[in-house]
């Protein structure tokens, strides 16, 4: 492990927060910094050390702090927007980190679908590819094993008025047990 003050691949807001990490006094643990298109940040900390949270509560656009899977300050999610679709993203849910690449991927998912298609999206996460496809498809069903991501995906469908998208909590390996008829499949495994 190498201590850094800046990551050239990270967004500016993340680099601002990186500079404050040493003030948390974490000896053994992990800190994850997530940022949104609005420059909001979530800070996720996993450690048994006593953490000096007061050192980071005043960060501009701080959306929330999660310590050992418990929300201890503000929210445990942020809102992301790609190609005019908004996504609630829980702190532990996957979301593409490169917005330019993900915008192209989401557009490809939408272009892949025709009106009348019934789409099954395995490993659907918070609904990123599913909701893009739902703009054209007759129906989209997303399958995801992370319960928070499924909840986010269903609320994201409502948030974007996409009534033709439904997300279910299940292991993608169990789809043979699900009664879903589809003619298009999206697979974006972890």
What are the residue ranges of the model-derived segments?
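Extended interfacial segments that mediate partner engagement and assembly in macromolecular machines
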Residues: 1-28
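Structural signature of eukaryotic scaffold interfaces centered on beta-propeller domains
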Residues: 34-36
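Short small-residue beta-strand/loop micro-motif enriched in glycine and branched aliphatics
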Residues: 1-4, 41-43, 89
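Rossmann-like S-adenosyl-L-methionine
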Residues: 10, 48-190
